[in-house]
């Protein structure tokens, strides 16, 4: 999704590939995959981001996701 990142493409690809492998291992359909990924994102936000920044970061993530789908 991000166009500019402090992380390497290799780091991102490795994590994404692992996550895809887990979803494939469980034969998760698209809706279940999206629910799981949404729960993961919510968990990361609520446990790792200060409450004062949580909503703004969630909105930025949502906007980035929408833009990624639009430009596909």
Curated annotation (Swiss-Prot):
InterPro entries: UPF0352, YejL_sf. Pfam families: DUF1414 (PF07208). It comes from the Bacteria. Belongs to the UPF0352 family. This is UPF0352 protein HI_0840. It comes from Haemophilus influenzae (strain ATCC 51907 / DSM 11121 / KW20 / Rd).
